[in-house]
Amino acid sequence: MIQLKNLRAGYPGRPVLEDVTLEFRPGEVLAVLGPNGCGKSTLLRTANGLLPKTGGEVLVDGVPLEGLSAKEVAQKVAYLPQSRSVPNITAGRMVLHGRFPYLSYPRRYRREDHEMVRRALDWVGAAELASRPLAELSGGQRQKVYLAMALTQEAPTLLMDEPTTFLDVGRQLEVMAAARRLAQEGRAVVMVLHDLPLAMRGADDAALLSHGRLAAWGTVEEVYASGKIDQVFGVALRRVETRSGWQYYYG
């Protein structure tokens, strides 16, 4: 589990996060919500050590993040950024990169590493893409490949920055279903999301940021009931109870 305690973070001359206390819990999908520029991506980058904190604590299974090596962090936390380069390699080779934290120098992949790639691609429903160049794949197909890479990393916490952006509705639902499966397998899944109804339907908990501070945190029902979403976004988010549970929409 990752714990953020009174976290402060930002960039030279530009503080972003202030006094954020939050937990990424195993077995749960956490949606990180908030307007553009409120610090969502900064939160994820600080939580896995890509961006140094300026105050507070980041604890990984009770251990301060700065006390872990880069390899140890990578074995604990997988991170899928919003923007990624598209290297001139096959999808299978890209997924194999998830095994880097477990290799010694010089890097030599073992039979079990290749088997893990096969299983991960099968898990995300992309086994047929293994030999195809990454550059030839659609956005939805690439998203599956990146998720498979994160699975081969075997990290108990998965951070995803806007994984549904630019995907059609069907692919968005596939990503959310995959997040749910991962949580059911015991992982902590943290997703920065812009689609509020999608987030509220698909997540267990929600963390709402506003101007770098935590405006609300709790179950999606608790955050909805707080009225903070309407205040922060300036929209009217409503819900209706159906046979399949609460459905959210803009009123």
Question: Where are the predicted features?
Answer:
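The feature captures the beta-strand-to-loop junction immediately N-terminal to the Walker
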Residues: 33-35
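Conserved ABC ATPase "signature" region
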Residues: 96, 111-129, 154
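ABC ATPase nucleotide-binding domains
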Residues: 231-251
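Catalytic Walker B motif of ABC-type/P-loop ATPase nucleotide-binding domains
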Residues: 158-162
